Curated annotation (Swiss-Prot):
Biased composition (Basic residues): 537-553, 568-577
Source organism (scientific name): Dictyostelium discoideum
PROSITE patterns xref list: MYB_LIKE
Protein name: Myb-like protein V
Biased composition range(s): Acidic residues: 271-294, 448-480, 510-533, 586-609
Region (Disordered): 237-333, 429-803
Entry keyword set: Coiled coil
Composition bias type Basic and acidic residues, residue spans: 786-795
Start-end of Low complexity biased regions: 295-315, 625-636, 666-733
Coiled-coil spans in chain: 258-323, 400-429, 463-496, 573-616
Disulfide links within the chain: none
Composition skew (Polar residues), residue ranges: 429-438
Length: 803
């Protein structure tokens, strides 16, 4: 037979003359095999976006694996294939594959051998289209197909050997009439071939017109064959049609149960055969046994066999009944109307499957779980609800559904408000009932105290009816005891009025505890109330004095705030202490008057020396000034005391004395505040008077030489000037007798010698030389001349006093 008669090549011009015929189920099944093996069954996963991140393109994972089953496709298709258009569709499918497998090569080699005839291979349309690049496929697939063609041309001998007598492979069965049917399939389904629903941007097509694989999000598959479901047992050999498989689960279970039943029956038969063989062996070994024993054994074995067969049959029946009861047959496939109603319900109501079942599927046999599963499958296929709605509804229908959803939400909100109002009214009624019940209980217990009525009501409400009598008796006893205690308290309060409470601001935590204890004692002891009040006040004063922080201010002068603190502390002192301080102050005033008579005449020299001392005192550390503060007293009038200075140019004439008195009067008005800035005047509590060791006022400067290096401003002309740094303690002067003039002179000489022996001579001389106060009218003397002048001053003082 000539190949031209058998092979009918359909040209593109003959499409119009083809009669429109219904697609046979066999042809549809063949096409579905190709379609689902390439797109559905093997789970071709195109690149998609999740959370705005592009998933890296897999190396076609299962798409490479599906070529293993290409031989199964050839067994169903290539033997009946005779159309170029279906080959073009197949090549378009290959256009989505990046790395074809060896099985593809074998498939194409068989295909070319099928198309090969004596000399017409070049005239075939598919080959011509491949060479001219007329097929809308990628260049990579074109190059791949050209490579296979080159291989085929290089091996013509093998192709000729494979050809039969007719020049065609013997394994292929030619069916010329199917060419027209395949053309009908292509014309009917080519518009339903996979096209992307969503593309990242418009420039996502290749030059050939195909879509770029990386730009495609997901594909929309045809609805003609989407209801087909294929069961894969791992080997991809068993493909079941939708009629055989009902919603996946029941059919799987039934198939598995049938297989289990077969396995169990086989096992039982094997067990029976083993038992029979064992029995035969036993009979052969026991030939010498009695006939009775043999007959008994045979009867037992036969009984065991029958029992085993019965048990196996019963088990199989029970399993089948259980499977039928657990997995009843579900309704058939989903129709478009059911899918539309499900999508509409989800858009209006939301994911409330029970309500959707009641409102939209009340008459059908579908369950809420099935509705949920169907919606999940639609989401996997289309994506969001919007895309699902676009696939099943028009724009006008979608707008109407959205309006219905808004109305449904408004109704639900109104229902919620009505429920809230009803709940609030019910709560008000319940509270009114409870208040009425509590008022009834209060009327019974009016005779009891007001403090215990709430407790009794709560107890009466909570207790059971059996324990009410016991609770009432206990409450009566408690009421009697409380009444007695109140009567006692009223009597005590009427007899003795309570002491006024002190201010809370001055009370520390310790005092509050002591006050509470003391208040308890006042209730017991009525007669001693006045004494206790006096004791409490003294305790508060002492605690306030102790709690006040003791801070010794160093490197600073006494401020006005310290004077206020001293006055506040002096008020807190007891009466005998105040009397002693008054005597001390009077004695100090008398001594100050005597010292003022012996001050210097020139005010400028005195002020310049004081300024120097102030500058040096600011530089001295706190540890050095603290030694002086320990010997001071807590009197406010000491701030106005002036240092005793012996004038070096005093004469015995009366004129000089008059002039001196005038200067003193002026000086008292000019410099009353300067001595307040000395660091030695910092006050302390009167408890430190024990540290004052000297007995006479002239020997007090002996305390200060503890830190001799920090007093460079001391001039040798005024040896008694140090007495200003340490205040006088007049308390011990009352016991001493008045000293004579000679004794005072001797003491001054001793003190002067001590001061001269100090290591400050060099620093004093330097201060004299480097002093900035050279503009004064007074001529400064050197230390040597001052020593001479001091002796002369002593004589003049003695002469003046004698006169």
């Amino acid at each position: 037979m000539d190949t031209s008669q058998d092979i009918v090549i359909a040209d593109s011009n003959t499409t119009d003359n083809v009669e429109v015929r219904s697609i046979s189920p066999r042809v549809a099944a063949i096409f579905d095999d190709i379609y689902y093996f390439f797109y559905k069954e093997i789970d071709i996963e195109f690149t998609r976006y999740t959370d705005n991140k592009l998933i890296s393109e897999r190396m076609y994972g299962k798409r490479i694996d599906f070529f293993i089953s290409i031989l199964y496709i050839t067994r169903n298709i290539i033997e009946s294939y005779n159309n170029v258009e279906l080959l073009k569709c197949f090549f378009k499918m290959l256009n989505h594959c990046s790395k074809p497998n060896e099985n593809i090569e074998n498939f194409l080699m068989k295909l070319f051998t099928y198309l090969h005839s004596d000399s017409i291979l070049d005239n075939i349309e598919i080959i011509r289209a491949l060479r001219d690049n007329k097929l809308k496929i990628r260049r990579e697939t074109q190059d791949y197909l050209n490579q296979i063609l080159d291989k085929f041309y290089k091996k013509p001998k093998e192709a000729e050997e494979r050809d039969g007598d007719d020049g065609l492979p013997m394994e292929f069965v030619r069916q010329d009439t199917l060419s027209k049917l395949f053309r009908e399939i292509y014309n009917d389904i080519r518009d339903l071939l996979p096209e992307p629903i969503q593309v990242r941007h418009l420039l996502s097509r290749n030059i050939d017109g195909t879509f770029k694989l990386k730009e495609v999000l997901f594909y929309e598959f045809d609805r003609v064959s989407e209801d087909h479901w294929f069961y894969d047992d791992g080997k991809q050999s068993n493909i079941y049609s939708p009629e055989e498989i009902n919603n996946n689960t029941n059919n799987k279970n039934s198939v598995l149960l049938d297989a289990n039943d077969k396995n169990e029956n086989n096992n039982n038969n094997n067990d029976d055969a083993d038992d029979a063989a064992a029995d035969d062996a036993d009979d052969a070994d026991d030939d010498d046994m009695d006939d009775e024993s043999d007959s008994n054994n045979n009867n037992k074995n036969s009984n065991n066999k029958n029992s085993n067969n019965k048990n196996s049959n019963e088990n199989n029946k029970n399993k089948r009944t259980k499977s039928s009861s657990k997995s009843p047959q579900l309704p058939g496939l989903w129709t478009d109307e059911e899918c539309r109603s499900l999508i509409k319900a989800v858009m209006i109501i939301g994911h409330r499957w029970i309500k959707i079942k009641e409102d939209y599927y009340s008459t059908s046999k579908r369950k809420p779980s099935q509705l949920k599963d169907k919606m999940r499958s639609l989401r996997k296929r289309y994506g969001d609800i919007k895309n699902i709605a676009i696939a099943y509804f028009t724009k006008a229908e979608i707008i109407e559904i959205e309006k219905l959803a808004v109305l449904f939400q408004q109704k639900e909100e109104a229902q919620k408000l009505a429920k809230e109002k009803i709940d609030s009214l019910s709560n008000i009624k319940s509270t009114s009932n409870t208040s009425a019940a509590s008022g009834h209980n209060k009327g019974k217990n009016e005779n009891n105290d007001s403090d215990e009525e709430v407790d009794q009501d709560s107890d009466n409400d909570s207790n059971n009816e059996d324990n009410q009598n016991e609770s009432e008796s206990e409450n009566e006893d408690e009421n009697d005891n409380n009444e007695k205690e109140k009567e006692k308290r009223n009597k005590k309060n009427s007899a003795v009025p309570p002491a006024p409470a002190p201010p809370k601001k001055l009370k520390p935590i310790e005092e509050e505890e002591s006050d509470e204890e003391h208040n308890d004692s006042e209730e017991d002891s009525q007669e001693d109330s006045e004494e206790n009040e006096y004791i409490i006040k003294q305790k508060r004063k002492s605690n306030q004095i102790k709690s006040s922080p003791k801070k010794l201010k160093t490197n600073q002068s006494v401020d006005k705030s310290e004077d206020v603190n001293q006055s506040h502390k002096s008020k807190l002192k007891s009466k005998p202490q105040r009397k002693v301080e008054k005597e001390e102050s009077e004695k100090e005033e008398s001594e100050e008057e005597e010292s003022e008579e012996e001050e210097e005449e020139d005010d400028e020299d005195y002020e310049s020396e004081e300024d120097k001392k102030k500058k040096k005192s600011k530089k001295t550390p706190s540890n050095q000034t603290s030694t002086h503060t320990t010997t001071t007293t807590t009197t406010t009038r000491k701030s106005n005391t002036k240092p005793i200075v012996v004038s070096s140019e005093e004469d015995s004439s009366d004129e000089e004395e008059k002039r001196r008195t005038k200067t003193l009067s002026k000086k008292s008005n000019q410099t009353p505040t300067t001595p307040t800035k000395k660091p030695s005047q910092t006050p302390t509590t009167p408890t430190k008077k024990s540290n004052q060791t000297p007995t006479t006022p002239t020997k007090k400067p002996s305390q200060t030489p503890i830190t001799p290096t920090k007093k460079p401003n001391q001039t040798p002309t005024t040896p008694t000037k140090k007495s200003s740094q340490t205040p006088i303690t007049p308390t011990k002067k009352s016991t001493n007798r008045p000293k004579s003039i000679e004794e005072e002179e001797n003491e001054q000489e001793e003190q002067h010698e001590k001061n001269q022996n100090k290591p400050l001579k060099k620093r004093v001389s330097e201060d004299w030389s480097n002093s900035s106060d050279k503009t004064s009218n007074k001529r400064f003397k050197s230390p040597e001349t001052l020593n001479k002048d001091s002796k002369e001053n002593k004589k003049t003082i003695s002469n003046s006093r004698r006169k």
